Amino acid sequence: IGCVEELDKAFNWAEKYGLQILIDLHTAPEGQNGFDNGGICGVCKWSKNPEEVEFVLTVLERLAKRYGKRKGLWGIEVLNEPITESVWELFDVPNRYPAVDKEMAAGSGPNTLAFLRIFYQEAYDRIRKYMPKEKYVVIHDGFVLTAWKDFMREEKYVDVVLDTHQYLMMAEAAGCEQTIEGYTCFVKEHYEKEIEEMEKYFPVICGEWCLFNSLACGCDTKGGQSVLNGVDGAKEERLTLDEKNEIYRAVADAQLQAWQKGSGYFYWSYKLLTDTVNENGWLGWDSWDLGRCVDFKWFPTQKKN
């Protein structure tokens, strides 16, 4: 497992300072989503190759064996963002994330929910061999949050958490109006309602979210695309600080209220390495950085009475 020594260090730090770790297997050979975060843009063939599926299962076993009884372990997430048909089409993945190696990308396509169900069940069995029941096995919803109501209902499945990733850029791609009212209504009607509904079946965490949105960027980002996708961003500030603050505080409050219907949430990410001041096309992308959001007072740091 690459860089496993660094993960060893992370556990030592976590246990020293009273933190807990959710290990997330973020990529799979031949890609599980075709996104840039899947390791190979435009390539999504992992689930079609039984040998690679088995390899991922053995990696999960090794992780569970190495860290399953560590005090600092909260749980293991089986796989990050395995894409299914709806988001594959919504994002038009082959064009949004064009493959460098066209031959390698040939035959790429979304994973099926039927495959993910079988894979998750096998992964659970492999992980639980080495991990106590009080540690969590986390499964991603494949971007279809309400599709799992009848899944893992048997008594053998203990402490399974359902992870959903909800970004306003995805709401925009789905047709959400790029206004404060548009965002807050979408969050309430979709994120909040669906999380509350699914909490009846699993503990639900929003494993990725942020304040990023096109309105605060001052331009339509086409669902969160950037200069890396060939979409030019704003070249100069189009909003005042007060206007930005109003937008970000409104979407922060709406989203935090939605996540309260579930069992937890993780902001993505704590730190953004992109220089939004000196690099062209990145105005408005500070909101991916939680530290900057707190510094700029976009993110509430105290609960309201």
Residue ranges and their predicted role:
Residues D8, E15, M198, W259-Q260:
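Anion (oxyanion) recognition and catalysis
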Residues L22-H26, E77-L79, V138-H140, D163-H165, ...:
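A cross-family glycoside hydrolase active-site/sugar-binding cleft signature
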Residues I1-A28, N37-E77, Y124-R126:
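An active-site-proximal structural segment forming one wall of the substrate-binding cleft
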Residues G72, T84-D253:
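Extracellular glycoside hydrolase catalytic/binding regions
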Residues A234-N305:
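Aromatic-rich peripheral "rim/lid" segments of glycoside hydrolase catalytic domains that contact
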Residues V4, A28-G31, L63, Y67, ...:
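A structure-centric feature marking long, well-folded core domains of fungal metabolic enzymes
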Residues H26-N33, F143, W268-T274:
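Short, solvent-exposed turn/loop segments enriched in Gly/Ser/Thr/Pro and often Arg
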Residues P29-K48, F91-P98, T221-S226, S287, ...:
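Aromatic- and acidic-residue-enriched segments that line the glycan-binding/catalytic groove
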